[in-house]
């Protein structure tokens, strides 16, 4: 809304470090929709996967012995920004925009983009632009990577009641208690689902029969007409919004294994 960014441009137009990476050929909108055509597969259980070997250590998860103790200069991939710029490559068989394929690297590119444009760490942007305007009962906190950079892909910690406040603001198209927090146009666009959006999800065989009709602007869309959508966390956390019924629900979970929106239990929750 401020004119600082155009979603039709590439992230590399704003972050030169991404030149030559998988994110050089995509638009910001494709990143927002998880349709960026990355060669990197997000696998949480295979210890030989790229996630275990490179992304998880950069995220400071410390899955690998000694990973959390690595010092700067001892690896080309130290923090998440290194991983995004130096490791993630494009999938030559999947053009950008063709297929929905959830990948956490997209979220971290967006976090980097926000931080670069606002010229301050992501946690300070969230604090100043969103959290301070919600009348939150408690402080939130955010995880950092191995380089002490706030990460966007996960690790945002808040109470259920404060998360519900955020959901109410999203339901009301960016307004909370009469104060404008986020642009209405942005929060209307997220449910402006087009045929190309539903086709992108249908092309992923894992989601072709799912309840979701599309994924747009980092939200899972259930019903565009009812403006019904969700934010879903890796271990079963959900913020559910239905503007037609004026509903917001939040539930937390502590599922030991990574949750899947395709799991049989998930539609039962909804």
What are these regions (language model features)?
Residues 1-6, 31, 110-114, 163-170:
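Active-site SXXK
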Residues 2-44, 89, 117-154, 158:
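Active-site helix/loop module of the DD-peptidase/beta-lactamase fold
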Residues 52-55, 144-158, 204-205, 209, ...:
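Carbohydrate-binding/catalytic loop surfaces
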Residues 89-96, 106-108, 145-152, 225:
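Flexible glycine/proline-enriched surface loops and loop-helix/loop-strand junctions
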């Amino acid at each position: 809304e401020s004119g600082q960014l155009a979603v039709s441009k590439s992230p590399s137009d704003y972050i030169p470090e991404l030149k030559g990476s998988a994110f050089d050929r995509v638009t910001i909108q494709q990143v927002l929709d998880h349709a960026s055509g990355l060669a990197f597969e997000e696998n949480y259980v295979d210890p030989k996967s790229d996630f275990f070997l490179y992304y998880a250590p950069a995220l400071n998860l410390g899955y690998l012995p000694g990973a959390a103790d690595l010092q700067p200069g001892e690896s080309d991939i130290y923090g998440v920004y290194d991983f995004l710029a130096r490791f993630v490559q494009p999938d030559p068989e999947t053009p950008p925009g063709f297929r929905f394929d959830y990948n956490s690297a997209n979220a971290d590119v967006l976090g980097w983009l926000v931080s670069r444009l606002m010229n301050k760490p992501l946690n300070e942007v969230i604090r100043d632009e969103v959290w301070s305007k919600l009348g939150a009962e408690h402080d939130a906190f955010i995880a950092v990577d191995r380089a002490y950079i706030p990460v966007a892909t996960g690790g945002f910690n808040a109470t259920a009641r404060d998360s519900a406040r955020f959901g109410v603001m999203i339901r009301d198209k960016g307004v909370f208690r009469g104060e404008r927090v986020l642009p209405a146009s942005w929060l209307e666009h997220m449910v402006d689902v087009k045929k190309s959006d539903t086709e992108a999800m249908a092309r992923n065989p894992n989601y072709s029969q799912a309840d979701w009709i599309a994924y747009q602007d980092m939200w899972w869309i259930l019903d565009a007409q009812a403006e019904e959508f969700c934010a879903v966390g890796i271990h079963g956390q959900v913020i559910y919004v239905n503007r037609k019924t004026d509903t917001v629900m939040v539930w937390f979970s502590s599922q030991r294994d990574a949750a899947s929106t395709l799991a049989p239990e998930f539609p039962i929750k909804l």
